[in-house]
Regions:
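Transmembrane alpha-helical segments in integral membrane proteins
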Residues: 31-56, 173-182
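Hydrophobic alpha-helical transmembrane segments
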Residues: 30, 34, 82-87, 102-103, ...
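C-terminal membrane module of polytopic membrane proteins
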Residues: 130-194
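Membrane-interface elements of multi-pass transporters and channels
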Residues: 1-6, 50, 54, 58-59, ...
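Juxtamembrane helix-loop-helix connectors linking adjacent transmembrane helices
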Residues: 1-40, 58-73, 77-80, 189, ...
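Juxtamembrane helix-entry segments on the extracytoplasmic side of multipass membrane proteins
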Residues: 25-31, 102-104, 156-162
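Membrane-interface helix/loop boundary segments of multi-pass membrane proteins
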Residues: 43-87, 114-121
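Functionally important transmembrane alpha-helices
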Residues: 86-157
Length: 194
């Protein structure tokens, strides 16, 4: 049945990830940062935010840009991008074939999509995606080198350490609010000066 297939996919992804992450040398860390942080950040953001989200918005790919100029090509007034953001976020999460983490990954994909809309720069979601993946790679690397119990490392943010997840979520929400507010104020001051 479907549930068994999902469990099998989840377990396969976990085994593959652990095989990649099971390094304790600086060279291995650098390779993992390239393969598991930098390349996915660039490739997935180009695909899901740079292409799919734009297609869902009905925009041509001709005006796609990695440059953050003073005038963003994305306008909340011109189009309502919410549907495009959420469609690309759902696909982003589904393509990872890790169903038990579907909702958090979908929310992260939506955050990346909104950051693209708010800033007009694909570099912001790429940087955020890289930072997220790099932090996981670095945590795993340090945990292995220090001999930490990997079961406890994997459980960070759940059960006994649920408070860490809550604190992280609150900090993230405050950061998003502050970032969005600064973008809005910056746009308002640029309109006033013109």
């Amino acid at each position: 049945p479907l549930e068994q297939w999902m469990k099998t996919q989840e377990e396969s992804a976990k085994i593959l990830t652990e095989q990649f992450m099971n390094v304790t040398t600086i060279g291995g860390l650098i390779i993992n940062l390239l393969l598991m942080a930098l390349l996915p950040a660039i490739a997935e953001e180009l695909t899901f935010r740079g292409v799919l989200q734009r297609l869902f918005e009905g925009k041509s790919l001709e005006d796609a840009s990695l440059q953050n100029g003073s005038k963003a090509p994305y306008s909340l007034k011109a189009r309502i991008p919410h549907l495009a953001i959420w469609c690309s976020a759902i696909l982003f999460s589904a393509i990872h074939m890790q169903f038990y983490g579907f909702v958090p990954r979908m929310l992260m994909g939506a955050l990346f999509g909104y950051m693209l809309v708010w800033t007009g720069s694909l570099w912001i979601p790429i940087l955020m995606h890289f930072t997220n993946n790099a932090m996981a790679v670095l945590l795993y690397f340090v945990a292995l080198r220090q001999g930490w119990d990997m079961e406890k490392v994997d459980a960070i943010g759940t059960n006994d350490t649920l408070w860490l997840g809550v604190v992280s979520m609150v900090i993230t929400i405050i950061g998003i609010y502050a970032f969005r507010r600064s973008i809005t104020m910056s746009n308002a001051s640029s309109r006033m000066s013109n």
